[in-house]
Amino acid sequence: MKMTAREMFKKLGYKYNKCRDRNQMIEYRKEDSTSVIFCIKERVFSVSEYCEPKDITVDELKAINQQCKELGWI
């Protein structure tokens, strides 16, 4: 069975931030201040650590791609 983006991010140690999900943003955050934010209206996402751009792993990219698919972006 294929995992959802939320499940994939959880497996990578991210927590879903419900406060950000108001049909405008979706945020996943790690304890180390890494965050992945999807801005739904603008159809963009960002990955940062301590408010600075961050390199991502292949597994993070897979989770990001899955979230983009679920949002209908790709």
Model-derived features with residue positions:
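Amphipathic alpha-helical segments
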Residues: 2-17
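Short, compact, well-ordered microdomains
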Residues: 55-74
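Acidic, low-complexity, intrinsically disordered interaction modules
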Residues: 18-61
